[in-house]
């Protein structure tokens, strides 16, 4: 374990001192190393998929990633097993999850093929407690994680920077979710949505 930490630190130090023209090849080497080291932690991990430096994983044994998908730097991928649910987080083929994005799953989150997200996107099917009067008297961190309904994102959806996909939502294929939108209900196929809460502003078909 120590040798892996030392190698990771070495790559980090080299990125600070090497010329810029060498920086990107060094990044590619580091990304390949991280992917090789961590791919076995997942339930399934497709050929050609990559994990960038800084990705944080929490109980990835419940996570399936398809082929040729990229999880960019500093993303958080987590599942939250509970006494009532075994999480099922499925990320499809040809996905690009933007930097600093966060996917958290207590029950079921399905992301279809060809989905692209910007940075700082949140996709969640859960929350701390059930938002009841009883829970209001308990510190949020002390409340049990509770799934509020599955999230299902169809193929070829484009999600802009800082958008939030809340629990119990289905987004149809081919949709565009504008930056900063908060999706609280189902979105039909080929819709463009924006706002808080997100509303349909255009249909693509």
Across the structure, where does each feature detected by a protein language model lie?
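Domain-scale signature associated with acetyltransferase and cell-envelope carbohydrate enzymes
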Residues: 1-125, 150-155, 165, 173, ...
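Short, flexible, mixed-charge acidic loops at enzyme active sites
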Residues: 129-139
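A short acidic, glycine-rich active-site loop
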Residues: 139-151
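Conserved beta-strand->loop/alpha-helix structural units within folded catalytic cores of enzymes
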Residues: 161, 166-167
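Nucleotide-sugar donor-binding/catalytic module of glycosyltransferases
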Residues: 170
């Amino acid at each position: 374990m120590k040798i892996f930490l030392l190698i990771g630190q070495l790559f980090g130090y080299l990125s600070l001192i090497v010329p810029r023209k060498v920086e990107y090849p060094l990044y590619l080497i580091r990304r390949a190393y991280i992917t090789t080291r961590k791919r076995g932690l997942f339930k399934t991990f497709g050929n050609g998929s990559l994990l960038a430096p800084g990705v944080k994983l929490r109980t990835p044994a419940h996570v399936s990633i398809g082929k040729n998908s990229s999880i960019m730097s500093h993303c958080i991928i987590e599942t939250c097993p509970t006494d009532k649910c075994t999480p099922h987080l499925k990320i499809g083929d040809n996905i690009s999850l933007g930097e600093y994005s966060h996917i958290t799953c207590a029950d079921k989150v399905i992301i279809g093929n060809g989905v692209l997200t910007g940075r700082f996107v949140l996709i969640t099917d859960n929350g701390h407690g059930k938002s009841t009067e009883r829970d209001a008297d308990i510190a949020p961190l002390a409340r049990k994680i509770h799934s509020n309904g599955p999230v299902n994102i169809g193929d070829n959806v484009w999600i802009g920077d800082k958008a939030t996909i809340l629990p119990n939502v289905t987004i149809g294929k081919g949709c565009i979710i504008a930056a900063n939108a908060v999706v609280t209900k189902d979105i039909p196929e080929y819709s463009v949505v924006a706002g808080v809460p997100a509303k349909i502003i255009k249909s693509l078909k």
